[in-house]
UniProtKB/Swiss-Prot annotation:
Entry superkingdom: Bacteria
PANTHER family reported in the protein's UniProt record: 60S/50S RIBOSOMAL PROTEIN L6/L9, LARGE RIBOSOMAL SUBUNIT PROTEIN UL6M
InterPro entries: Ribosomal_uL6-like (IPR000702), Ribosomal_uL6-like_a/b-dom_sf (IPR036789), Ribosomal_uL6_a/b-dom (IPR020040), Ribosomal_uL6_bac-type (IPR019906), Ribosomal_uL6_CS (IPR002358)
Reported function: This protein binds to the 23S rRNA, and is important in its secondary structure. It is located near the subunit interface in the base of the L7/L12 stalk, and near the tRNA binding site of the peptidyltransferase center.
Stated name of the protein: Large ribosomal subunit protein uL6
Species: Maricaulis maris (strain MCS10)
Keywords for this protein: Ribonucleoprotein, Ribosomal protein, RNA-binding, rRNA-binding
GO terms for MF: rRNA binding; structural constituent of ribosome
Gene Ontology cellular-component annotations: cytosolic large ribosomal subunit
UniProt subunit comment: Part of the 50S ribosomal subunit.
NCBIfam families, alphabetized: L6_bact
Length: 177
């Protein structure tokens, strides 16, 4: 029995969940998100929230059970509190600034990199070396953060590049004379 899958997903006040046969739509203060369930699991809405259960006892159904429950919990968390990723620019002259909804990055290249924020994602620059990405969809927030980080990933010798706040960069020793 799945330790995660057997727990019901509580629906807090101010959030409405619409459950059909194979899909779930969740509306809240941060927006509206929806997902479709895989064929191996079924969902029911009860008094204590949404309960996910496997249709049979196959290995795949048991694997999907916990995953689908976690995805539903991510939807509810996203429309209530949202998700946030913070990036840090490390390096001389590495700067970030907003131009409307686009993020302009100076990363030591011969040109500036401009990244357009997708719909549903908010990018903010506090200090010139810090970028905050927020949104309701956990997967899209992480994907946008990874795409921005990919412009200049941290290198192991001096640690220069774009890294997640709190990320540990494994360092290497330089050449010996």
């Amino acid at each position: 029995m799945s330790r995660i899958g057997k727990l019901p997903v509580a629906i807090p006040g101010g959030v409405t969940a619409t459950l059909s046969k194979t899909a779930l739509t969740v509306k809240g203060p941060k927006g509206e998100l929806s997902m479709t369930f895989v064929d191996e699991v079924s969902a029911e809405q009860g008094e204590d929230g949404i309960v996910i259960s496997p249709r049979d006892e196959t290995k795949k159904a048991r694997a999907m059970w916990g995953m689908q429950r976690a995805l539903v919990a991510n939807l509810v968390q996203g429309v209530t509190a949202g998700y946030e990723k913070n990036l840090e620019l490390v390096g001389v002259g590495y700067r970030a600034q907003m131009q409307g909804t686009s993020l302009k990055l100076s990363l030591g290249l011969s040109h500036d990199v401009v990244y357009d924020a997708p719909e549903g994602i908010t990018i903010a620059v506090g200090k010139p070396t810090e970028v905050k990405i927020t949104g309701a969809d956990k997967q899209r927030v992480g994907q946008v953060a990874a795409e921005i980080r990919r412009f200049r990933p941290p290198e192991p010798y001096k640690g220069k590049g774009i890294k997640y706040v709190g990320e540990y960069i494994r360092r290497k020793e330089g050449k010996k004379k």
